[in-house]
């Protein structure tokens, strides 16, 4: 088990934690006894039950796909557990990933923030938590992204972004990905308006001219 400077405080009976952060990168140092970092999913669940944090935060950085799936499973458990499900669950992502956000939505995650690979600090954590609003809701972040964003695994750690409206034959990247596919502007994209295939479970999308 990974040990932290706060991991053994099972007898703590003071105020509840302001937040509990699960970040397996291990690059965070709490500044207050009411802030806590853990470096594993097991520790996170244990401390979430024991310490009753006001907010639970899980960070997804660049990592193997299997580790990402494990963190999603943690989110599922946190929102199903009767002792942790009422605490707002915030997920920090290093990039937009529609498939992952859809999994987090199903898991019951409340909020999402995109922070790239920013090094976290106590002040930054508090700023993000206090500033959470409707635009950070998982549903809102999910609906912004193009439904044709697909991901093909290259290896255990990397995926290629492709356009489902073009039969997954067009690789996406650069400005087009960030300015169109990952924003509300995807609704004006010619591939979105005239797809060669429909996204799973959705009605056919047609252009304004009915073509």
Question: Which positions does each model-derived feature cover?
Answer:
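Conserved phosphotransfer microenvironments
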Residues: 54-80, 93-94, 100
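Output/docking surface of receiver
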Residues: 37-40, 93-127
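Conserved phosphotransfer cores of two-component systems
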Residues: 50-51, 78-86
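Non-catalytic signal-transmission and effector/linker regions of two-component phosphorelay proteins
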Residues: 1-24, 197, 204-209
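Cysteine-centered metal-binding/redox modules
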Residues: 121-211
